[in-house]
Design a protein with these regions (language model features):
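Helix-loop boundary and gating motifs at the non-cytosolic
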Residues: 8-58, 231-270
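C-terminal transmembrane helical hairpin of 12-TM major facilitator-type secondary transporters
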Residues: 295-340
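Residue-level signature of mid-helix packing/kink "hotspots" within the transmembrane helices
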Residues: 58-66, 148-149, 275-283, 368-369
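Symmetry-related core transmembrane helices of the 12-TM Major Facilitator Superfamily/SLC fold
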Residues: 167-184, 388-404
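Helix-to-loop junctions at the C-terminal end of transmembrane segments
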Residues: 63-76, 159, 281-293, 379-380
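Cytoplasmic helix-loop-helix junction between adjacent transmembrane helices
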Residues: 107-145, 343
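Structural signature of the two symmetry-related core transmembrane helices
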Residues: 79-93, 172, 296-311
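Juxtamembrane intracellular "pre-TM" segments in multi-pass secondary transporters
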Residues: 1-12, 187-235, 420-422
Length: 422
């Protein structure tokens, strides 16, 4: 333990602020994910309209996550993150003022982007400050999971007590707390030409110009070129498969559980179980990086996670078995996620953390958009049970080429940082 404290990055001498950004940042996004269906239902909107509103938050992150990540690398992660957190704070009181579908959808698109980019900033900042250390990334993920657990409870209770206005004003307060955490967190080094890292005598910021708000094709090309790094390609593929399992859970998994007559409370217990065990598993990620082969651990953990979610129809509807499957899957995902982040962070170098987080967020949003409708189409064509089998088999087949990527990553010494950007 003494050696770990001695080896702690200087920027984490007091890690409370950066861990707090994890708790509040991820919880901030989940706060609105939970709130928008409640608000739309109170306005009498149809299920189709609610579905469109829920999905609208993904629109900007799909196209702009890479651009925002590059801005973080160029102008400072904390600086860019604060802008989007302040944007979300300013938009929160507008929700109760807009009871119409189209204005609400436009607001949801912009606010969803702001929340996503703010959370990306927290992920980028911890990767920069920890230099990709899986143990600290795991602790950050642990606190983030706490945020996702308490946010729905808080907003649900406030909604029951006072409705839309108090709930969205709590969103303002949540954003202000996140602002304080970011202001107390240290800024990381940015690329040459921007502000130097903490401890340098010079305090020069890169000058922001209006044209910097526009995405550049060259930035996207440079970002996608990171996929040429075997470690990045391998971890992006694993991250897509991991999120595909989550896409199954948030779509037809719930449908299946309702078909076997589980109550809403029971389903909630299953969802809480995976969040809790995922948080606990995150604390083991650093040790897993040290005691085993990280690449093989990530692949085997992802394969087992896919098997556990796709085996749902074959558990006989027995609650104990369903619970054990969720506990095991949560633990595996909790261990694997910080390892993925760590391998990526070490592979790309300190000045491209925002870009790789943006690339990862793009893959995340794509899997969230693609998997539920594909699975729904399979269920409509055959059955819900068949959709688990067909999609599960396809996802497992996708793991085969990852073995080749793992071998390439090992051959290219993924622990060595990529050349620094100039």
């Amino acid at each position: 333990m003494t050696n770990r404290v001695a080896d702690r990055p200087a920027a984490l001498a007091n890690p409370v602020a950066i861990y707090t950004t994890g708790l509040l940042g991820m919880g901030y996004a989940d706060f609105y994910i939970f709130l928008i269906p409640l608000y739309a239902l109170s306005l009498g909107m149809s299920a189709g309209e609610i579905g469109v509103l829920a999905g609208a938050r993904h629109l900007l992150p799909v196209f702009l996550s890479i651009h925002v990540g590059v801005l973080m690398d160029r102008f400072g992660t904390r600086r860019v993150s604060l802008f989007f957190v302040w944007l979300a704070i300013s938009l929160a009181p507008m929700f109760p003022l807009l009871p119409w579908f189209w204005p609400l959808m436009l607001l949801q698109i912009v606010n969803g982007g702001a929340l996503s980019f703010g959370w990306s900033g927290s992920q980028t900042l911890i990767a920069q400050l920890t230099e990709g250390d899986a143990e600290y990334l795991g602790r950050f993920n642990f606190f983030a999971r706490i945020g996702t657990t308490i946010a729905p409870i808080v907003v649900g209770g406030v909604w029951d007590l006072g409705g839309a206005w108090p709930a969205y004003l709590i969103g303002v307060a949540w954003g202000m707390l996140l602002t304080l955490a970011l202001l107390r967190a240290p800024e990381a080094q940015i690329a040459p030409g921007g502000r130097p890292g903490v401890g340098h005598s010079e305090r020069r910021w890169a000058r922001f110009q209006l044209r910097d708000t526009l995405p550049r094709v060259s930035d996207y090309i440079a970002c996608f070129s990171l996929v040429a790094i075997p470690a990045v390609a391998m971890t992006l593929a694993l991250f897509f498969l991991r999120n595909a399992g989550n896409g199954i859970q948030f779509s037809l998994y719930v449908v299946y559980l309702k078909q076997i007559n589980l109550t809403g409370t029971t389903i909630g217990v299953l969802f809480s179980a995976i969040e809790i065990t995922s948080a606990l598993g995150s604390l083991f990620a650093g040790r897993a990086m040290r005691i085993g082969d990280p690449q093989r651990t990530m692949l085997s953990g992802t394969v087992l996670s896919i098997l556990l979610i796709c085996a749902t129809p074959f558990l006989g509807g027995v609650f104990v078995l369903l619970l054990l499957a969720q506990v095991a899957r949560g633990w595996l995902q909790g261990v694997v996620q910080p390892m993925i982040f760590s391998v990526q962070a070490k592979a790309v170098g300190r000045y491209r953390q925002g870009a790789v987080v943006g690339l990862r967020q793009t893959m995340n949003r794509l899997s969230s958009i693609l998997i539920p409708p594909i699975m729904g189409a399979i269920a409509d064509w055959w059955s819900v049970t068949a959709s688990f089998v067909v999609l599960g088999g396809f996802l497992l087949l996708m793991c085969i080429p990852i073995v080749r990527l793992i071998r390439r990553a090992a051959a290219s010494a993924i622990a060595e940082e990529a050349p620094e950007a100039t």
